[in-house]
Every structure is written in C-alpha cells, then in structure tokens.
A protein has these predicted regions:
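Enzyme catalytic cores with a strong preference for nitrogen-chemistry domains
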Residues: 1-362, 380-389, 416
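ATP/NTP-dependent adenylation/nucleotidyl-transfer catalytic domains that generate, transfer
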Residues: 6-7, 161, 220, 229-232, ...
C-alpha cells in the first residue's frame, strides 16, 4: 500500500458450464494479469469455478469433486503469488451444500465465507440446492487438502498492511439488512461481492444505485463482480457487471454485454475512507449498536483472519485512476450543481434580509469575479423576495490600479441589472490618509495596498449606515485559505455570500449565469469578466491601462491552490500525498518543482492567516469544505506549520 492506496481488481472470466478445468484456466490467466499490474486483491463472480447456472448438476458428486480438485490446482498455482484471490465455489459441510467464497493466497485457503441470503423467487431457486450460512454451525472441514473453519460468524480479513475487507455473495447486498452493514461497522473498509446477477430492463441502473448507496452509507469501498457471457442463456442473460465504488462514487466499471473476459482494476484510497469515518460521528455512534440485531437478537461473533505477508519484492506503485484536477467542480452535472450552489447563496442572503427587516444592501463592485457573483446573488435574492432592485446600492470605487476593462464591465453590469449605483473614487482620500501617516504615497508596499482596501470597506460601511442597509461581502473561500484579503478591509462585511465558494467554482458560476440570462449585454459583460485576469488592482495599471498586478503571480494558480485546499481540508491528507496527487492530476501542465513551490506557499499562508478566519462574518456553506470558525474549521491562530513545511522540503 502506497500513499494510502490499495490496488484491487474485479474480474469477469470466460466460463463454461460445469467445465471446471476450462474455468480454472480462465481464472488463472486473469490472476496472472492482475498480479502483473500490482493488484493486491482480486474478486471473481459467484461460482466462477463451476459456472452459476449448473442447476441440478450441483447435486452431482462428480461436479463437486471436480470443483474441489480445481481448488487444489488453484492453491498450487498461487503458491508463489502475493495476490489475494476471492473465488466462488460450492462447499459441502456435513449434510449442507453451501454457496461460498474462498479467499486464497500463497497456496492456502485463508477463509471460506458462506452465502447468507439465498434468493428463491422469480428466476432464482437457490434453496433447491443450497443451505444458508444461518443453517450452519461453526465446523472445521477438510477441503482441497487443507483444514478450514467454515462459520456463520462475520469474517473480517486483514491484509499485511492492515486493510480490512469482508465478503458478500450476490443476494446478500439486496437484503434489507445486508451483512455488509455489520461488517463495515466492525471495521471492514472494502466489501467484495461475488455475484450472478441476471439482466432485466431497468435493473442495471437500480444495481448501480444500490451499490453506490451501500458504499456511501457504510463509508466503504465496494468491489463487485458478476458473471457474464458463457453462463447459460436458457431463460435469462448474464450481462457481466463489474464495478468499483469508493464512498458512493463509481471509480471503475466493466463494459456491459461484452463477449470477452474483462479485468477492471483501480486503486482504493483507504486513507480517505478512514478519514471520513473518523470525521463522521454518526458512523462512530452506529458502531456502538452493532452487537444487537433488532430482529434476531445478538448478532454472530466476528472472526478476524490475517492474510499472509508479502513474499516477493514490492512492485513500483502506479496510480491508474483519474484524479480530477478541479475537485470542487462536478463536470458530469455542472449546470445542476451551479444552480444548486447559486440557490444556496440566494436563500442564505434572503433569510438574513428577512430576519433583519433590511431592504437595502450595499455592495462594492470592481468588475472582478467575486464581486460579480455576489451582485448576481443579491439580484436573485431581491427578485425572490419581490423587493425592488433599487434597494441594491452597487458602488464602484476606482483606485490607483483600476483598469479600463474592469471599470467598464462593472459599470455596464450595474446598469443592465437595474440596481442603484454610485461611483466614488478612493484616490483623494487614500492619498490624504497616506500623507497623514507619513507615507510617501509612491512606494507600492503593503501599506499602500491595504489602505485602499480599508478605505473601500469604510465607504461601504458608512453608506450602509447612511441608507440603513447591510454590507454584502464578496471574498471567496480560496482567498480566505490563502489569507489573500486585507484584515478589516475586504475581509469584513455584514454577510459574506461567497465565503465557502472556491475561486475555481466562482468562475463556473458566473459562466453559468451568463448562459442563463436573457439580457445579452449582461451576458457579454459576464463573459468578459470571466476572461479577465484575477487581480486586486491595488497597484497602478500599465501605460495602456491594462492590469499589471496579477494575483496568481503572487499566490500561485488558483486551480492548484483549490486542489491543495480540497485535499488538505476535506480529507486531511499530508503534504506528500497531496503533492503526489497533484502531480497525477496536473501531469503535463505543471512541473513537479512548480507544484512543490506553490504547495509550500499554500501551507505557509494557510497557517499564518488563520487569525483572519477566526473572525469571519456569517455566510452560507455551499459544499463539503468550509472555513467558518463556527462550523467546519476550528484552528488556533498561533498553530505552528514547521512539520508540514519540513515534509514538503523533503519531497
């Protein structure tokens, strides 16, 4: 396991009904292929040794003997392999014939897990041939040349790296209370399911939803393998489904209705799952109730089974799963996500306006992304409350660095949205203030810049008093993380609608609104604002009036910072893992040295600027990451970042 990842595979082998030799050969080929890719655990379909559709042939002793002999051959085949294989087999325990999953490693049967829920409806008649795990008493049997305990107890397997996995067989996942509920609450992090799921119209979508929900509810990974082409089509068809889920997200799947064998591999982030569980108090509380079954009384005891340590040299780790370079962006449902985020912001502001009986909002509009989004939210909130847009006082405050482009866009946007407007140049007041404190007014230092930000905030606050209104904050989540705001300047407001919206998402939201509006002049201004370089415009523009001070030159690309922010806050990853993931996500766009530089900068700025976040104004949470000191993020302002920076230096 590297960086908290474990590589797993779900296989759909070629199968012939009751031909155990052919089936074993197909299984071995896929095991070798998976081992070559560094897979640590591979799962096969239900009854992959015999074929699922043997029906009454399961009563034939020859088939049972052939199956056991095939298992002996598989044990011999895996003797020198580190990979853990989970295969489906019929197993006799006294008078009972059980539908089982065998866990095999290094030529040994690590464990045998019998199926609990046997479907006996519609096209399924499993109770005709098999007994349930609930019919079984713990029994040691001699099988495939080894002595193995077969038990109804919850079996939890542990790899040499401490990863815990459990097993369900097909119908188990469809039960009202699946075995995976108790297994995951007992510590299992990956569930493997050996299945033989028939195809029906609509069933595939339902199955995906079922697996996603179970994975999400149990904060686990779910690896599913169902038999495909080669099973009998006498009355049903097996389409060959294979999925890998991680906390509700599908990270890999097989091609449906393929005639060929398939091997689906991916890496599961065990560290992320563990972080989720530690953070989720509901999951922790549910673990306290796991020993009592509300239907049948006390649940069976759990049994821990240790897998064997690695014999061979560890292969070089390669990550095959795709890492989204913009984790805050849901590319598959972007329009719906933007509308949802926008409405959360609108509803938050609407509630604050109703509560305060406020019918006047004061907002500074610069022609940049953040103030544009805040203004759009404000307009939608006023419309929703059926308030006159004249109650929105949009103020543009040109300064030393204001460019013609941003000024023009700000003025056009305010005019076309039909809000009340005011223009106040901050230059005279800032010059006077700088002279009052002994500044030469020509040195472009932090005093020069911050004086402008605080002057703008003072104007907005005073106007709010004058008009009996509230100041709407415009700063975003990314700026708060980096401390890229002036303390008691743009840092302060009476309600901050963008406080949990990262910069990369702000851009998408403004783009979304530009595509939805029917006012072409508004759309044109919004599109140009999206294309404008991000800048606080606190130092003079160049000779042509163009932006000279570009934020990303100082703090790094926002797409990198938002990537760092997401994994640092959402999952608590250490810098080395964030660096590794960033190199995967931005391969070909940023060099490793550049990523390291900006990661170091991000961590340092994040720690140093906590004092600004400790006194944030109220604002709505829109996603899973927030820096509100009253909600998601509580951190001492004087915390030391030495260890984090030291790890980055060693990369």
């Amino acid at each position: 396991m590297k960086y908290g990842f474990i590589k797993v595979a779900t296989a759909i082998p070629e199968v012939r009904i009751a031909d155990t030799k052919f089936n074993l050969d197909a299984i071995e080929k896929q095991i070798i292929a998976a081992e070559g890719q560094g897979v640590e655990i591979i799962v096969f379909p239900e009854f992959c040794i015999t074929g699922y559709t043997c029906q009454d042939l399961f009563r034939q002793q020859l088939l049972l003997d052939d199956s056991e002999h095939a298992m002996m051959m598989l044990l011999d085949f895996t003797r020198q392999l580190d990979i853990i294989a989970i295969v489906g087999i019929p197993v006799c325990v006294g008078p009972l014939l059980l539908n089982c999953a065998a866990v095999v490693q290094h030529g040994k049967i690590i464990g045998i897990v019998p199926k609990t829920y046997l479907p006996n409806y519609a096209e399924f008649y499993e109770k005709r041939w098999f007994a349930s795990a609930r019919d079984l008493c713990p029994t040691q049997i001699h099988y495939a040349g080894q002595t193995v305990l077969v038990t109804p107890a919850r079996q939890i397997f542990r790899t040499a790296d401490g990863v815990k996995f459990g097993i369900e067989i097909c119908e188990d996942i469809w039960a009202p209370i699946p075995p995976s509920n108790a297994l995951t609450l007992a510590g299992v992090e990956i569930m493997f399911n050996l299945s033989a799921s028939t195809e029906q119209i609509g069933k595939h979508h339902y199955l995906e939803s079922l697996l996603a929900q179970q994975s999400a509810r149990t904060l686990s990974a779910y690896v599913y393998s169902s038999c495909g082409f080669g099973e009998s089509s006498q009355d049903v068809v097996f389409g060959g489904n294979a999925f890998i889920y991680e906390n509700g997200s599908q990270i890999a799947k097989a091609e449906r209705f393929s005639l060929d064998p398939q091997l689906v591999t991916s890496e599961i982030d065990i560290e992320k799952l563990r972080t989720e569980r530690r953070s989720n108090t509901t999951f922790v509380n549910a673990q306290k109730d796991m020993y009592v079954d509300p239907i049948g009384g006390v649940l069976p005891e759990k049994t821990y089974i240790n897998c064997l340590p690695r014999q061979n040299a560890e292969r070089e780790f390669t990550l095959t799963r795709k890492i989204n370079p913009q984790p805050f962006i849901q590319s598959s449902h972007m329009e719906a996500a933007c509308e949802e985020v926008f409405n959360i912001q609108v509803m938050g502001l609407a509630k604050r306006l109703v509560h305060t009986h406020c019918k006047k909002v004061v907002i500074g509009v610069s022609g940049g992304l953040d103030s544009t989004l805040a203004l759009l939210v404000c307009v939608r909130a006023f419309d929703k409350l059926k308030l006159d847009r004249n109650g929105i006082l949009a103020v543009t405050m040109p300064g030393f660095g204001t460019s013609k482009r941003t000024y023009t866009n700000a003025v056009a946007l305010m005019k076309e949205l039909g809000v009340d407007t005011k223009e106040i140049s901050i230059v005279p007041s800032v010059v006077q203030h700088l002279k009052d404190i002994g500044h030469d007014t020509v040195t472009h230092d932090s005093t020069f810049e911050n004086a402008q930000a605080r002057e703008r905030t003072q104007i907005l606050m005073d106007l709010a008093n004058e008009y009996n209104g509230m100041v709407l904050g415009t700063g975003d989540l990314s700026e708060l993380a980096l401390g890229w705001c002036t303390y008691n300047g743009d840092h302060m407001s009476m309600y901050a609608v963008n406080a949990s919206v990262p910069k990369t998402l702000v851009r998408h939201l403004v783009t979304y609104v530009s595509g939805m509006t029917k006012n072409e002049k508004v759309a044109e201004a919004l599109r140009d604002i999206v294309d404008t370089p991000i800048s606080p415009e606190l130092t003079p523009a160049d000779e042509e009036g163009k932006i000279q001070q570009k934020t990303e030159d100082f703090v790094g690309p926002y797409e990198l910072n938002d990537f760092f922010l997401y994994y640092f806050l959402r999952h608590g990853f250490q810098p080395s893992k964030i660096y590794f993931l960033a190199n995967q996500a931005f391969a070909g766009k940023y060099e490793a040295g550049e990523i390291k530089k900006w990661l170091y900068n991000f961590v340092g700025r994040f720690f140093r600027n906590q004092f600004k976040r400790s006194c944030l104004p109220d604002g709505p949470k829109v996603g899973t990451v927030s820096l509100s000191p009253r909600g998601d993020w509580r951190m001492p302002s004087d915390a030391d970042c030495t260890n984090w920076l030291a790890e980055i230096e060693q990369l």
